[in-house]
Amino acid sequence: MTPQEFYQLLAQQGIELTDRQKDQFERYFELLVEWNEKINLTAITEKNEVYLKHFYDSIAPVLQGLIDNQELKLLDIGAGAGFPSLPMKIICPQLDVTIIDSLNKRINFLKLLAEELGLDKVHFYHGRAEDFAQDKAFRAQFDLVTARAVARMQILSELTIPYLKVGGKLLALKASNAPEELEEAKNALNLLFSKVQDNLSYALPNGDPRFITVVEKKKETPNKYPRKAGMPNKRPL
């Protein structure tokens, strides 16, 4: 997908990018490739592939009507090089985006990226999701949490649901749809007072299948969740 095809596809879906937004995506690509030489950010570095498999893929929640340009507080867990939240931030500048990542080198890249792209209302924190979720400044503070190919729902739910306000939503972006994954996660979702609201399936323009599972938080999360760092992974709920 060339940048031109990317713009055209978005325009067909009612999103006309300004010259500034096009420049932001272009600079994002350049910095991604440049920094990837120093720290491992992505295996995908060919321009057309980045536009398809990182940029277009990341804005799926916007294209699917799950997010629009309003002042929502969004947390991105395990964003790596800023996916999916920063491409969505370029398209929906009103979003207030927070990224937590366990690798300081990636946080340094994201800070520089946000500065270079002129993004405001973006916040980056170095640490573990399990630790920040017990901090009052973060717990139950967000309207949306996004996670792209981070972990199975059984684990992911414990890492993300505590951050949501009641009525807030987790958007889990995945490349495969395993019904058994949601079956496995039933107990975790019940313990965390949350419920699968939707499971959307769609395809990238090249035909690759993609899925977004939408989980809504129904009640406050019990204080004991999330458990200590590493526990959700070792002993899923």
UniProtKB/Swiss-Prot annotation:
Keyword rRNA processing part of the UniProt annotation:
yes
Q: Which UniProt keywords apply?
A: Cytoplasm, Methyltransferase, rRNA processing, S-adenosyl-L-methionine, Transferase
Class in the EC hierarchy, top level: transferase
Query: Which CDD domains does this UniProt record tie to the protein?
Result: AdoMet_MTases
Instruction: Enumerate the residue ranges of region (Disordered).
Output: 218-237
Which GO molecular function annotation, any one, does this entry have?
A: rRNA (guanine-N7-)-methyltransferase activity
Question: Highest taxon of the source?
Answer: Bacteria
UniProt EC number: 2.1.1.-
Cited Gene3D superfamilies: Vaccinia Virus protein VP39
Q: What is its main location?
A: cytoplasm
Looking up Pfam families in the UniProt record yields: GidB (PF02527)
Q: Where in the cell is it found?
A: Cytoplasm
GO CC annotation terms, alphabetical: cytosol
Q: Which residues bind S-adenosyl-L-methionine?
A: 78, 83, 129-130, 148
Main role?
Specifically methylates the N7 position of a guanine in 16S rRNA.
**What is stated as this protein's family in its record?**
Belongs to the methyltransferase superfamily. RNA methyltransferase RsmG family.
Name under which the protein is recorded: Ribosomal RNA small subunit methyltransferase G
Q: Which organism is it from?
A: Streptococcus sanguinis (strain SK36)
Its lineage opens with: Bacteria, Bacillati, Bacillota, Bacilli, Lactobacillales
